[in-house]
Amino acid sequence: MFRPGGERDFQTSARRMGTSLLFQLSVHERELDLVFLDHSYAKPWNAHPDASSARPTRMLFVTPRRQPEASGDSDMSIDVETVTPTPMPLYDNQKARSVMNECDRHVLFARTVADGPPPPDDWEEHINKTGWSLAQNKLFNKVLKALQAERLGRLANDGACNEPVLRRIAVDKCARKVRHALSSVSWDIKLTHWLHNTLLESLSLAMLAAYLDVLQTLKSKVPSLIDRMLLSSSVKTGAAGAEALSLLLKRPWDPAVGVLSHNKPSKLPGSPLILIAPSGPTNPAFPTSRRMRFWQSQLSCLGKVIPINVHVGSGANVGITQCLEHMIGTVRGKVIEVHSHFPHKPIILVGWNVGSLMACHVSLMEYMTAVVCLGFPLQTISGPRGDVDDPLLDMKTPVLFVVGQNALQCSPENMEEFREKIRADNSLVVVGGADDSLRINSTKMKTEGLTQTMVDRCIQDEIVDFLTGVLTRSESHGHGSGETRDLDAEKKKPRRELPFDLDRSRPSSPAVRDMSSVCSSPTASPKPKTVGLSPAQKSSLITATQLLKTHMQRSGTVLTHKQAQAQFAAFMKHNMLVRKSIPPGSPSCLFVPVPSEQVEGLERDDMRVHLKRRQTPSPTPTKASKRAKIKVTIVSHGDAAGNTPGSTAQEVGLSGKPLGLTVGQTTVSGAKELSELLSAQRSGGLAEVSGALASSEGSFHSLQGSVISRSSSPVQAAGTAQAPSASSLLQGLSLSLQEINTKSPGVPSTTQVSGGKPQGQGQVLSSLSPGSGTLVRAVPMVSTGSGMTKTTAIHQLLTNGGLAKLANSLPGLAHVSSQSSGTSSTPRSKQRRPR
């Protein structure tokens, strides 16, 4: 057996790899496909267009198909000087040799305690065969021949690097021959007693040690027959000798017992329940074989093992069909019972030979996570499985098939064809040199340096790999179905990391949600929300906080907590006074510009982009810049006295979208007064603005009075005189903007706001660019006036007074004003170009 790197310590490798003995034992036998080497994108050699669910076959200890051809050169250089280093075995060599020589130590102890001298080396010549029958002679000769062959094997393998494995193979072969010899006499009690006593008295030390090894091996296979054969010898040897012999024969030795005991398989994810389906009716009188006990102990490391026992009556009328139906019903009932007790535990059904076939049929009836078929019987009396009417083709449970390369009931080629027809996800593991029960022959063991225990452990590693993938996928699907969220949909959604995107996509106030609903749905009608504190007051708090914070940061002063509370109290008091002074039916609109001298530290790139946008106005809304330069607060007046306040507020601090300002419809004189107020307060700072808000209450009321006195008849909104909300104002303003666009079809619209039926009348001054340094606070007024003066009022607002200057400073408003002045054919439209 060739392994690259002879000086590699396989014990260290085994400890590093943990439970993956498969990597160390079978990786050197994995055949490299030349197609994969040259074309990595190609499919496996066994891939089929219909086999979408069949995974590539895994090979364990399978001899490569392409053997190296013998060289035709007669002259070959043979290196006779270099000493090839001895490869280290995969097991603990020291511990393996210790358990290997255990029977020799017991023989030396037993013969030393005995009174008589040990028998000589030519012990066979000193045996008195007088009076032996023909059956006795034949039985003795067969057993002696097997023991002599085992003795020759010991001498031949003495000092070999893998002597424990070779010794184990020789002992198993000798035990098989002795068992055949005892079976030829039907395990007759008299003959077996006579043979055992004769061998104990006559055999030499080396031959007696070999005989004890054979008894130790047969005790694990046929314990009841060996116990009956040793019953007579216990009387002669005494209690101490019988007890020592029973302890010796209790456990057969194995070279890899140390590695397997220290490196056990790890638990599977989800803590599954492993049900072992029986291969036939079970009888409590016959204990489970040692190999099956080893498999159960190894599978118990993966999860909870539940063996299923099937008891069939001993009546003569029970046929094979009835027995199979009873077994399938028992297995199905056990699966249902386990499901009822553990509804959230994954269930894995494992079966050997016929048990694997029953497991597949039960998976068609009941839900389970996976099925493991060990030694699947593919051949039947009517031919191989996989016909059109075969119910196994409709399997949906993931299944793993483990078959032997030399199996008579299932060849790897036929298994490949069968797997291609199965709908369920399936995998195949082929064990080289194994039969239907996955037992490899002695020739394969000797050439590979393996034991059956090592092969079983490699098969278990393959099972662990398959079940880990299945359970991981089932857990992910289970979490996805159990929760309301959709992980795939969340992955497809764009992730917004910028704060202004979050503010823009998710409004934080009821007013913003109402406005967004109006803009998105033409037929939506926002409902007033009953809250303890009106949204206008909340927005006023937010606005005051940000204004004070910005002013303090720019002025370099430190605002204490008490000062902030005092500022809040003053602002709230002023706000309440303003709201009380305004009549319920006539809310007002006030523009308070903050001078652009206070907005410092702006990037030059933003200014260049702003200039370019002013030179080439685009009908589409401009993109948001990274830093906001405009803060607009829209505060709508509440409902009439005694009604639930439906006022809304919106503060745009970080959004770069086009902002709409609701302007009450006024006459020309009202627009002039408003522009005078704007120009009068343009020179003041932020502190002056707050002072002006408190000191100019009379001017505010005079402005309001002039606006109300010049207004015409009120708007009829659904037959009531309620004050319009922010959403209704937007609906009316959208209609006004549409009228502007219809009267001047050549003018591209700067914003589009969809609304339902008009509940209020007003205009929208849109596309406020963030590049401007003006901070505006807008308090909406009721839009009163007839529909005949909508367009003229907006034109006058845009062409006269300080509002036109404000529009010139903003690219969006400048675009609207230029278009409106163009329709009136005034020569000043050419002079008012954006600077």
UniProtKB/Swiss-Prot annotation:
Its main location: nucleus. One of its GO terms (cellular component) is NSL complex. Pfam families: Abhydrolase_11 (PF20408), KANSL3_1st (PF23154). It is found in: Nucleus; Mitochondrion; Cytoplasm, Cytoskeleton, Spindle pole. Residues 817-828 have a biased composition (Low complexity). Coiled coil: none annotated. Residues 474-506 have a biased composition (Basic and acidic residues). The keyword Cytoplasm applies. Transmembrane segments: none annotated. This is KAT8 regulatory NSL complex subunit 3. It comes from Danio rerio.
